[in-house]
Amino acid sequence: MGTEQTVRSFSRHAAAGAVSIIEGNRGLFDGVNAAGEFSTGELAKLLNAPVILVVDCDKVTRTAAAMVLGCRNLDPQLNIRGVILSRVSGSRHATVIRQAIEEYAGLPVLGTVPRMTDLPFTQRHLGLIPPPEHDAAQHALDRAGMIAEDCLDIPNLLAVGESAAPWSVDAFPNPEQDERGNEPITIGVIKDSAFQFYYSENLEALSDRGAKIVEISALAEKSLPDVDALYIGGGFPETQAGRLAENASFRLSLKAAAERGLPIYAECGGFIYLGESLTIGDAHYPMSGALPVSFSMEHRPQGHGYITLEVDRQNPFFPVGTKVTGHEFHYCRVLTLHESESFTACRVLRGTGMDGKREGLCRYNIFAGFTHLHALGAAGWAQAIIGKARQHRAERQSKIISPSLRKRDAGGF
């Protein structure tokens, strides 16, 4: 998303707190190209945010100072205010690194975190296990809090945050916030342990335009409730494949709704669930069957990073010619695809998508793929879902009304 959208998002979400902590992605200068565009460093400059470097100190001492000094000198416009040392082996190790950084890089060390073998947060193929699947999530957070309290100079870290210039929440008001229809519509969002990855701005973009968001569980509910459109985000259907397969009544109701023309937008995990089956090793799990495609879970990522698409076929949500940018990270690949019963709407310009060439599988009123998009960087996405939902609602209402009209026209009144 662009500069204005980024600032608007930050302003909106930072309004409730005195200090906002922004977690950097990858290294400070790592972006989409050699110039570091869209990097953490560029974001820090855009938001006028002070930077705290977290330095991996495993098996290094004075070299840590060279890394910190290099970060300071590579872009002097960055406001780097301090350093946190990570994976330190002991007090002597920490003292040597601290002295080197303070002498050669001229920055204070605001925390020293020791190397830990029993980390409170467990991981798997796509990163940390998310709270809905973590039996001891609160315990892990409590332990992480104690580690932070023991190892970080929290008063000085907060002082760095408080030194940043204040933001006006209305600096970039959302120009689309009042684009609402007169009649409310309902958009279902499948949200449970299997489907849990949603950008908050995506849901806000829908509710800002008048949609009522209804959360649905594909694991616990017996059937899909009455909604005007459905949004199925990413998640981990592979870890819940058995439970998803066992809930046959929900799977069948979802397929039936798709066949009746329910507008459905699905990303990654949602795409997999709309398919016919998911193969994990020697096990095969039936999915909803709304799309004529099957998937296989692999041991290595099949797509990871930014993705750019060009829409070249008519579909339920994007005009032909639209450029769609997003992110993909999936271990699943398409195993079989019956192209005679469906079609792909997008050409892959960058990234992998379904096969390195095509993305966005369509059937009925479904658009599904591995791409995660962000509403603030996808102009028209929310409006398109709202529009399709209103259209579907009107079509259903006309079918309900038409029998009584036919009866009256036949002489009933």
Predicted features by range, described:
Residues 195-205, 212, 297, 304-398, ...:
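C-terminal and late-domain segments of enzyme folds
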Residues 407-408:
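Glycine-biased, low-complexity coil/linker segments
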Residues 1-47, 55-82, 91-95:
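ATP-dependent carboxylate-amine ligase catalytic core
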Residues 213, 237-317:
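Cysteine-nucleophile active-site neighborhood
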Residues 183-259:
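Phosphate-binding active sites in nucleotide-utilizing proteins
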Residues 131-183, 191-195, 358-396, 400, ...:
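Acyltransferase
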Residues 49, 107, 259-263:
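A short helix->loop->beta-strand "cap" motif at the edges of active sites that frequently abuts
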Residues 61-179:
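Internal gly/pro-rich beta-alpha loop/helix module
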